[in-house]
Amino acid sequence: MTNFNYLKISTTRKIRYLKLHQKNATYIVFLHGFMSDLEGKKPQAFLKFAKKNKISFLALEYSGHGKSSGKFINGNISKWTRDTTLVIQKVVKKNDIIFIGSSMGAWIALNQFSLIKNKIKGFLGIGSAPEFLDKLMWNKFSNKMKIEIKKKGVINLKHGDYEYPITYQLIKDGRKNKILSKKISQNINVTMVHGSKDKSVPVIYSKKVLKIFQSKKKKLVVIKNGDHSLSSPKWLKILKKELKLIIN
């Protein structure tokens, strides 16, 4: 059975997280995507990987996601970044970190570099989606949609079989978290993995992330016919292989 914990960050707010602690070991920190949670295949696969390889593991659900408290419509990149930092400070403490950022999780991970940079020893991005709120949502909204979201503060956006409530405050906050024009100087292993048939986020975003890093130890892996989530067994196998290369 998976052992979940809760971190109380205020009298009304708590963040659910999943932890495996191995003595003196580096932590793999998995950050999930937009409107996702820890019930998916990727966090479970990386938890098993950590157990097998005697590495510590941490994953969390941002406020308004999964079983963490709060409403999704009240959340934004700044709040979810802060949630992540608080849980890392509480759980990881002085151990080194290798980030795995899935989709929006890559954006949240990139934000951590200015906050806890000395502890970060590697980064694996999966279908990375930094700045997606402006570039992949707002810029594709019709004028009618833009007027509606400004007037009502929220719009329901259809994506496949799902409908997302997108708030104007979320869009505006995303603009305060621009990361693609920044530079990260640490010489760490950085690997971006992206599916060639990702219909949500174009491969160019993984390339943009690599440009942020001045490290010479960086690479892009494009998975032929891969989708956005890369959660099938054959793709999880590739992700675990790339993670092992980052660790070693």
What positions do the PLM features span?
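Conserved alpha/beta-hydrolase
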Residues: 43, 47-69
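Alpha/beta-hydrolase active-site loop signature
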Residues: 35, 62-67, 130, 227
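Gly/Ala-rich beta-loop-alpha elbow adjacent to hydrolase catalytic centers
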Residues: 101-109
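Short substrate-entry loop that stabilizes the transition state in hydrolases
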Residues: 35-41
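N-terminal cap/lid segment of alpha/beta-hydrolase-fold proteins
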Residues: 1-22
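The alpha/beta-hydrolase serine catalytic core
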Residues: 12, 107, 119-217, 221-223, ...
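Short beta-strand element of the alpha/beta-hydrolase
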Residues: 25-33
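Catalytic nucleophile-loop/oxyanion-hole region of alpha/beta-hydrolase
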Residues: 66-91
